[in-house]
């Protein structure tokens, strides 16, 4: 506990670092962990009494790969559930196939759209598209929609200005997206663009996204928009996407993937997603609950490992987390205020560390909150967590 207090004290002297869905360059390296075999169980984690604040390291080590095979198609979340999959984490592809029926939407992080010149657009990343995997998903769950993430990659400020000032540019941009979806047999797209302008040009972005949404809907395609948190992490300040923009876009957006994670950073160590902050981010966007079912509350399946030396930290995935539990046998501590577990351990020469990583209990609390608020869930990302997490969905 002393270490955690030290980390949080150090954090207050550092500036805010904003979060984006694609803030995963550091997570890419961490994702390349050795895969472990899953095990099957006749009972769910709920029935085994594992969803608890009083969780033991040894129980996680023993049970984390054991999910209930009998209830793979049984859903506990009534609203939409979106799961992200990344090309650099092969286990996520397997998780998506195994638990496909628990997801209404699966988004593979494959694509970029680039502006090649005047009224000329190209969708790249198509070499990553795995049609066999898509076929397997649809075979397992006919109702699950495949909606790849598409990122506005390599765009200059002038590129955005050119599009904002021309309806023809917008039409060509939207047309390239629609044609790609038809060619590749996608069900729609998750669009990530809002954070790239740092909160500037909001009304121009709204205008662009309304046109994209109308074009996708005309082709009977889903439109999911990634949005940053309504309250800037680590502050009481409003974020770069607020209620005004939400109300303008809600009629043409099918779902909003809300980034309620990455609350802390190596420069500002602490919890991944304090529960009160998560709740505030939803309520500020839609205080009257008019469009709540369109909000997908962001849920992280990765954690952070912070060092007391030099205010450093790195992402931590399931395999590494279990290794720490095995090696150090730490006590897991539950913080009721943030609704997260954390642990502390000491490396031989690396000093003291604090780890915030999701547990069955922290996930269940957020699923309960989503149910209470009337929202869905968006998980970043499949394969980073522990296999028994999916019993909860």
Swiss-Prot record:
One of its GO terms (biological process) is carbohydrate metabolic process. It comes from the Eukaryota. Keywords: Lysosome, Secreted, Signal. GO terms for molecular function: chitin binding; oligosaccharide binding. Residues 79-393 form the GH18 domain. It is found in: Secreted; Lysosome. Pfam families: Glyco_hydro_18. Residues 1-19 form the signal peptide. One of its GO terms (cellular component) is endomembrane system. Belongs to the glycosyl hydrolase 18 family. This is Chitinase domain-containing protein 1. It comes from Xenopus laevis.
């Amino acid at each position: 506990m002393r270490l955690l207090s030290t980390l949080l004290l150090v954090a207050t002297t550092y500036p805010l670092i904003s979060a984006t869905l694609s803030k995963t360059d550091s997570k890419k390296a961490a994702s390349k962990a050795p895969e472990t075999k899953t095990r099957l169980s006749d009972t769910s984690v709920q029935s085994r009494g594992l969803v608890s604040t009083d969780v033991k390291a040894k129980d996680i080590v023993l049970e984390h790969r054991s999910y209930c095979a009998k209830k793979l198609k049984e859903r506990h979340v009534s609203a939409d559930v979106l799961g992200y999959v990344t090309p650099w984490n092969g286990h996520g592809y397997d998780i998506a196939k195994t638990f496909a029926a628990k997801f209404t939407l699966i988004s593979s992080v494959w694509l970029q759209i680039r502006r090649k010149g005047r009224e000329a657009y190209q969708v790249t990343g198509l070499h990553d598209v795995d049609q066999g995997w898509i076929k397997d998903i649809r075979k397992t769950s006919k109702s699950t929609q495949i909606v790849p993430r598409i990122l506005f990659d390599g765009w200059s400020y002038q590129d955005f200005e050119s599009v904002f000032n021309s309806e023809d540019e917008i039409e060509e941009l939207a047309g390239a997206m629609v044609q790609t979806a038809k060619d590749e047999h996608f069900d729609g797209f998750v669009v990530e663009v809002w954070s790239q302008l740092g909160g500037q040009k909001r009304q121009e972005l709204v205008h662009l996204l309304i046109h994209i949404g109308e074009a996708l809907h005309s082709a009977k395609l889903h439109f999911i928009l990634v949005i940053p948190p309504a309250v800037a992490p680590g502050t009481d300040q409003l974020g770069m996407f607020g209620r005004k923009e939400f109300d303008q876009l809600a009629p043409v957006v099918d779902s909003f993937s809300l980034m309620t994670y990455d609350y802390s950073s190596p420069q500002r160590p602490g919890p991944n997603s304090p529960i009160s902050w998560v709740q505030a981010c939803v309520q500020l966007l839609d205080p009257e609950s008019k469009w709540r079912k369109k909000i997908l509350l962001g849920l992280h399946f990765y954690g952070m490992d912070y060092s007391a030396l030099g205010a450093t930290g790195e992402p931590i995935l399931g395999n590494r987390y279990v290794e720490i539990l095995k090696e150090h046998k730490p006590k897991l501590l539950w913080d009721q205020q943030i609704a997260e577990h954390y642990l502390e351990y000491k490396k031989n020469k690396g000093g003291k560390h604090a780890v915030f990583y999701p547990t069955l209990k922290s996930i269940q609390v957020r699923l309960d909150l989503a149910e209470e608020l009337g929202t869905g869930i968006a998980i970043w990302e499949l394969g980073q967590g522990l296999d028994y997490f999916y019993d909860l969905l």
